[in-house]
């Protein structure tokens, strides 16, 4: 087979990938992973797998030194000498780092000691993607490293407490991660970037907002309370999708998070701890994205109990979370589930687990729609009819 034949095959795969749906994309990704393993020797498989932590570490080094941003912003390749001048790093050390980054595809080598951006470079030049890497490396990394020992010490029993999970052992602290984070502003900021990292699919494109509103909207009423909403990215998406929709949008989060939020037209920010009574009464939507997966069931029950008394007869709780299928769980969903377990004693839930959680507080799920290939879904909960 010639090089031209290979290019034709690759082009065909790219063409098929571009036109298929999310399920098809996931299947292609899976086939490519299987194909890679089939081409590797046992040594290759071990080395490839074991290189993962180093790749993440080199990504963080690239972020810390501003390498990715410099390469992305340059119209021409940049030499090692130029990067040394910008960073002040040792030429020999930086040369070894750059060539390894290039070997992993994090940057692209164009000649001897000369580099330009790759597709990965462009991703990590994005401030939200860079912040997400920092958060995952600094917080999730140490937890992942000691997970095997932690599980063995506990005789492989379930983790159900955010005060007794891998995080406490990894960081030598009696605090939960969310108690520890406000004492470390750098990590609060990187967590905000992780939350703000754009997903290619949004709930606003899949939930029938207008149909559900009916005659509810009015300029003086609260359309949505975005609880634990971070920088307000989901409220901003709703406002962008429906710019003329009347009603107030209120983003609630703790002060340390809101300190890094940027003002936005038509969006209000309010300091609020969701373990305290919900102060906004009779909103149409009480929206929570990626809140419940951070917490064991006991705390999730407390969060819901703060919202229910504030609900009016037309109110709905919108839960934007994964719904784990019984088989064929996407790697992104399975990965996130264990990250939540390690750091927070949290969990990505199945539909049965969601139903059980709602049952504990007298709610029922009246709608459920999975809207992307990672099993992200909108669950609509209301007080159970008697």
Swiss-Prot record:
| A Pfam entry, by short name | Dimerisation
The pH response of activity is noted as: Optimum pH is 6.5-9.0.
Please indicate which superkingdom the organism of origin belongs to. Eukaryota
Which biological process annotations from GO are given for this protein? Answer: aflatoxin biosynthetic process; methylation
Per UniProt, substrate binds at 137-150
Q: Does the keyword 4Fe-4S apply?
A: no
Q: Which reaction does it catalyse?
A: 6-demethylsterigmatocystin + S-adenosyl-L-methionine = sterigmatocystin + S-adenosyl-L-homocysteine + H(+)
Q: What class of enzyme is it?
A: transferase
Q: What is its EC number?
A: 2.1.1.109
Task: Detail which positions bind S-adenosyl-L-methionine.
Answer: 228-229, 253, 273-274, 289
TM segment ranges: none
Please give the pathway this protein is involved in.
Mycotoxin biosynthesis; aflatoxin biosynthesis
UniProt keywords (A-Z) are: Methyltransferase, S-adenosyl-L-methionine, Transferase
Region feature Substrate binding, mapped onto this chain = 177-197
One GO MF term: demethylsterigmatocystin 6-O-methyltransferase activity
Which residues participate directly in catalysis? 293 (proton acceptor)
**Protein family according to the UniProt entry:** Belongs to the class I-like SAM-binding methyltransferase superfamily. Cation-independent O-methyltransferase family. COMT subfamily.
Protein role: Demethylsterigmatocystin 6-O-methyltransferase; part of the gene cluster that mediates the biosynthesis of aflatoxins, a group of polyketide-derived furanocoumarins, and part of the most toxic and carcinogenic compounds among the known mycotoxins. The four major aflatoxins produced by A.parasiticus are aflatoxin B1 (AFB1), aflatoxin B2 (AFB2), aflatoxin G1 (AFG1) and aflatoxin G2 (AFG2).
**Protein name as it appears in the record:** Demethylsterigmatocystin 6-O-methyltransferase
């Amino acid at each position: 087979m010639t090089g031209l034949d290979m290019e034709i095959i690759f082009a065909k795969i790219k063409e098929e990938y571009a036109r298929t749906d999310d399920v098809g994309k996931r299947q292609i990704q899976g086939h490519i992973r299987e194909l890679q393993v089939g081409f590797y020797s046992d040594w290759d498989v071990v080395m490839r797998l074991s290189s993962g932590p180093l790749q993440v570490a080199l990504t963080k080094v690239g972020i810390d030194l501003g390498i990715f941003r410099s390469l992305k912003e340059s119209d021409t390749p940049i030499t090692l000498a130029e990067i040394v001048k910008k960073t002040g790093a040792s030429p020999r050390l930086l040369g070894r780092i750059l060539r390894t980054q290039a070997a992993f595809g994090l940057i692209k080598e164009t000649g001897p000691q000369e580099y330009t951006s790759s597709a990965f470079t462009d991703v990590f030049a994005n401030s939200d993607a860079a912040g997400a890497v920092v958060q995952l490396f600094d917080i999730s990394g140490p937890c992942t490293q000691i997970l095997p020992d932690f599980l063995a010490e506990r005789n492989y029993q379930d983790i159900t407490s955010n005060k007794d999970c891998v995080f406490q052992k990894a960081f030598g602290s009696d605090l939960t991660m969310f108690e520890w984070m406000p004492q470390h502003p750098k990590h609060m900021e990187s967590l905000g970037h992780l939350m703000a990292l754009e997903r290619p699919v949004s709930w606003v494109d899949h939930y029938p907002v207008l149909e559900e509103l009916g005659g509810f909207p009015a300029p003086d009423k609260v359309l949505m309370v975005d609880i634990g909403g971070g920088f307000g990215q989901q409220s901003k998406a709703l406002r962008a999708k429906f710019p003329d929709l009347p009603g107030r949008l209120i983003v609630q989060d703790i002060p340390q998070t809101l300190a890094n939020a940027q003002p936005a037209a038509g969006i209000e920010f309010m300091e609020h701890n969701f373990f305290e009574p919900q102060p906004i009464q009779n909103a149409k939507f009480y929206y929570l994205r990626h809140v419940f997966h951070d917490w064991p069931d006991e705390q999730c029950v407390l969060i819901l109990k703060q919202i229910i008394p504030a609900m009016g007869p037309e109110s709905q709780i919108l839960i934007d979370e994964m719904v784990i299928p019984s088989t064929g769980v996407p790697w992104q969903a399975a990965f996130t589930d264990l990250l939540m377990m390690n750091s927070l004693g949290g969990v990505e839930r199945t539909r049965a687990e969601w139903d059980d959680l709602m049952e504990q507080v007298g709610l029922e799920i009246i709608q459920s729609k999975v809207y992307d290939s990672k099993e992200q879904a909108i669950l609509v909960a209301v007080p159970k009819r008697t």
